[in-house]
Amino acid sequence: MEKEIEIIVPFYDLDPMHVVWHGNYVKYMERGRCALLADCSMTYENMEKHGYAFPVVTMRVKYVKPAMFGQKIIVRTVHVPDENFLIFKYEILDAATRSKLCVAETKQMAIDIKTHESCFQLPEPFLTTFGGTK
Amino acid sequence: MEKEIEIIVPFYDLDPMHVVWHGNYVKYMERGRCALLADCSMTYENMEKHGYAFPVVTMRVKYVKPAMFGQKIIVRTVHVPDENFLIFKYEILDAATRSKLCVAETKQMAIDIKTHESCFQLPEPFLTTFGGTK
Amino acid sequence: MEKEIEIIVPFYDLDPMHVVWHGNYVKYMERGRCALLADCSMTYENMEKHGYAFPVVTMRVKYVKPAMFGQKIIVRTVHVPDENFLIFKYEILDAATRSKLCVAETKQMAIDIKTHESCFQLPEPFLTTFGGTK
Amino acid sequence: MEKEIEIIVPFYDLDPMHVVWHGNYVKYMERGRCALLADCSMTYENMEKHGYAFPVVTMRVKYVKPAMFGQKIIVRTVHVPDENFLIFKYEILDAATRSKLCVAETKQMAIDIKTHESCFQLPEPFLTTFGGTK
């Protein structure tokens, strides 16, 4: 599963160096991930209805080239099948040239909303959707 | 009731003009308000326990002078007694000179969390605490 | 001059009440304003080339109904002709029903970037573009 | 070199799960880093005076336990001597119990502000301050 969304860099995301402040890419990644999850009917609301939340447990980001005000950028989110975690890889690209601005990865763990217990394997129906094809 | 808190302007709040982005003052105002509310045991959690939320219904901000990176600023929050709304006035000042950077006002309305109904008068115990002295 | 843009409410803009945190509407307003300004070739970069910045000097916001996660909203930005300030009015609407979520107004003043002096009248070419029809 | 700062978790940093949104820890890390840098007279302004900017090139974050509204947290920032990069490690701790909420690492590279060229070794005076002792 993968998904591309386009974002136009807003003014309020810039820092005094006239580039996107590095922490704001985390927002772009979340927008990409939520768009992919919506495509497979796994919005946060649906996850909650199944009784689980999926907090991010690790995040790695590599910054390649800065994004500028008004620039059209693509967030390409790719799901990585895994039985234990919800794993996504991200590429943030310039929309015109598709040159890489940023690459990243996040890992999310299922938490039972009632008991607050962590799940070391994805519970159903998440295992079927995200667990890969053995 | 009034309260002063000190904030050191963080880098991530700046915009490309090297000053605090105007929308970020809303965060400073909320920090001032929450500090004042905590002093009178009216944290958001306590409000929720009493069954009410207090969304902001109007906000006015006047920007006088920009705040810069690393600047020590004071948020002075003053409660304005009122029977219908939770009203606060704010002054954001340079800590060293107390010169004015920003003045603002917010109005919050009580909402019954269960019924989602708006309260056109402050419910108890908020009326006693915030309603003024007549 | 007016302009409508569509925004899908992102997760990271929500607060614990499951609605958009009130300060985040300021970002939506800026995106609407920048889209309108781009349409008349008055991006912030162009303003800077003419030697002026336009900090927001006053802002008023009225919150009518909360916006939710994933909701499609419209920011309708309308320029109000004025010789002294850059004035915009905003309506934030539900995209499906066009019911009002938020109305707002901002006023921006021209500042000479070199001298840091405020302009009590819009300088050219801004006066011609934004000053109205007399 | 190391530095501890205290932060009280503000309401606007929370997400609908009533915990700090994962992207906001990046702000806490920056506040810790800037406090440490100020202690050794290496604020961003001073870096700029020397002709260099230090964009973050990689960031890794591991989330251990969520931070809540009003919680007092400590950001412990430790400089890791290195000749090529400005490297910091972070621990975000509950202030009362010092239990770990989050650990992270960032790497920053020197960029010559005039030429926009990356420096594969720290330039002076940064090499002396941050390069370690051999």
Tell me the role of every PLM-derived stretch.
Chain A
Residues 1-56, 111-134:
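Hot-dog-fold acyl-thioester-processing enzymes
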Residues 3-5, 68-69, 80-134:
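HotDog/MaoC-like acyl-thioester-processing domains
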Residues 36-87:
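Hydrophobic beta-strand-centered segment that forms part of the acyl-chain substrate-binding groove
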